Amino acid sequence: MIDVIVLGAAAGGGFPQWNSAAPGCVAARTRQGAKARTQASLAVSADGKRWFILNASPDLRQQIIDTPALHHQGSLRGTPIQGVVLTCGEIDAITGLLTLREREPFTLMGSDSTLQQLADNPIFGALDPEIVPRVPLILDEATSLMNKDGIPSGLLLTAFAVPGKAPLYAEAAGSRPDETLGLSITDGCKTMLFIPGCAQITSEIVERVAAADLVFFDGTLWRDDEMIRAGLSPKSGQRMGHVSVNDAGGPVECFTTCEKPRKVLIHINNSNPILFEDSPERKDVERAGWTVAEDGMTFRLDTP
Amino acid sequence: MIDVIVLGAAAGGGFPQWNSAAPGCVAARTRQGAKARTQASLAVSADGKRWFILNASPDLRQQIIDTPALHHQGSLRGTPIQGVVLTCGEIDAITGLLTLREREPFTLMGSDSTLQQLADNPIFGALDPEIVPRVPLILDEATSLMNKDGIPSGLLLTAFAVPGKAPLYAEAAGSRPDETLGLSITDGCKTMLFIPGCAQITSEIVERVAAADLVFFDGTLWRDDEMIRAGLSPKSGQRMGHVSVNDAGGPVECFTTCEKPRKVLIHINNSNPILFEDSPERKDVERAGWTVAEDGMTFRLDTP
C-alpha cells in the first residue's frame, strides 16, 4: 500500500502569492472560484503511520498543523516524519527544513548538488547533521526508505535526473546534471512518481509515466508565455525550468497514451488558469484525464 | 498615530511546535485552553496604509494572508509593505524574507552583523539587493522610516543593542555587540518599543521602557530552567539569550515601576505557562499589568 497526502499543490509563492492582486490570487484570497493552495509537497507512507515528506515547502509548519497524520502523539517530543526527500534546491522545496529544527532526528535525502546547496548556506546548520543525517541519493538506483528505528518502511525510492535548472539563488554557479530530480516510489507492487519540476519530457520520462500507477507532474504553467502575457514577469516557463501543461511537448500531449496511471498536476503557479474551478482550461485538463491537485487531497495505491 | 498589528506572538517553532506533544502544544492544536500563535512579528504604520514589518517570521506568508491590511489591491503586483526591520539573525526573525521574493521592492534594515549573516547565506540572494536594498542600521541614532515613494512615513526608528546571543546557526562565529537589537519607534509624540529577545535588563532598557507608551518585550520563558524541568531541552533561558518573565531581573520585576506604558509580552515559547488562558501564571502577569500577546491583536497610539 502507498498512502499519499497532498500537503501543498502550488508552485513557489503559493496561491495567493503575497504581493499579487492578479485575478487568480484575488479569487483564492476571497474564496470565490478558486481554492487557496500552499507550496508543493507530498507526504507518503506505506503504513499510514510513518511518513516521508517529498520537498519541504516554506509552508511546512502550517501544512503539518493542517494534517493530523503528521501530529506527534504520546511522548513530549517526536514526529511521524521519518525522512525528507528533496527533488531540487529551490526555495520552495527546501525552506521548510528550517521548520524541522528543534533537534528532532530524521533522514534528509537529496542529490549531491542539492546537499551542496544546503551546505553552502550555514542557516541549514540548524539541522545538525549529527541528528539529521544528510544522505546523498544515488541516481537510478532503488534504495529502501528506512524508518528511524532502522526497519525498512516498505517503500523503495528511485531518484532520477530530469531536465531542469539551477535554483534561482544559485544560477550563477551554472547548471548541474543532478540539480532537478524525479522520484519513483514503489511498495514492490504499485508505483507512484513525483516530478514537480521538469523542463522537457524525455522518452525516458514517458516510459516511467506509462508504467506507473499514480503520477504527480509539473503543472506550473498552462502555456510557456503565460507570465509574460499577463504582465506578471519577463520570464517564460522554459526560462524557469518548466514545460507547460498545454503546450506541444507538455504533459497533456506527451502522456496522452499513458492510460494506466492516475495523473495529477501539482506545483501549479498562481497564474495558471486551471486554478479557476470553472475555467475552460480546467475543463480541458479534466477531460484529458488529469486531476488538478488541491491541498489535503489523499490518494491510496492498494496492494491487491 | 502609530498603528500596530501583532502578526505573530510565539517564539521560534511557534505554538504548537511541529514536533511537540507537550501539554501546551496539545492545547493549542486542539483549541482547548490555549490559542495557537505563529512566530513573532509586528506590523507598524503611521497611516494605516503603509506598513513596516518588524522581523520576518517563517510564518510570514500565512500572516499576510490572515491580515487584510497587508493585502495588495489595484495593480497586478504590489504590497503595502514599505520595509522590514530585523532585530537579529535568528531563523525565526529572518526566514520570512524568503516569502518576500518575487522582485518586489522594499527596504531591508538590520544591524551590520545581521546583514552579514544574510550575506553569508546565498539563499537570501533571492531578494536581489538591487530591488530590495539592504540598509545597515546605525545604532542609537534616529532615522526616518521612508516609504517606497521616498516620502517619510512619519515614523522615526532608533535601534539599540541589547544583551543577547548569536543566532543558533552562527554561534561558532562568536558574539557580536550588534547581534541583538531593540527597536524604538516614534511618531514624534508617542513611542513604542519592540524588544523580542533580551538576555539581561540593563538600566538603559528600564529608562527606555519607563519613557515609552507601548512596550513589546521578550516573554520567551516564565522561568530560566523551564525547558530543562519540563524535559524539553537541556538549555536554560540564559543559554538561549533570554531573561525570564518571572525571575529576579526579569521584566515583571524590573519594569514594575514603569507605569506609563502599556506592557505586552511577545515571543512566547510554547513551554511558557502564561499561554494557558486559565493558568495561575497568566493571572499573575495580567495582575502585574501585562498583556499576553495574541496573533491579530491591534494597538493604536493616538496623537492628541
From Swiss-Prot, chains A, B:
Coiled-coil zones: none
Keyword check for Iron: no
Gene3D superfamilies: Ribonuclease Z/Hydroxyacylglutathione hydrolase-like
Function field: May be involved in the transport of PQQ or its precursor to the periplasm.
Species name: Gluconobacter oxydans (strain 621H)
UniProt cross-references to InterPro entries, sorted A to Z: Metallo-B-lactamas (IPR001279), PQQ_synth_PqqB (IPR011842), RibonucZ/Hydroxyglut_hydro (IPR036866)
Keyword Membrane in record: no
Family annotation (SUPFAM superfamilies): Metallo-hydrolase/oxidoreductase (SSF56281)
Pathway field: Cofactor biosynthesis; pyrroloquinoline quinone biosynthesis
Protein name: Coenzyme PQQ synthesis protein B
GO BP of this protein: pyrroloquinoline quinone biosynthetic process
NCBIfam families: PQQ_syn_pqqB
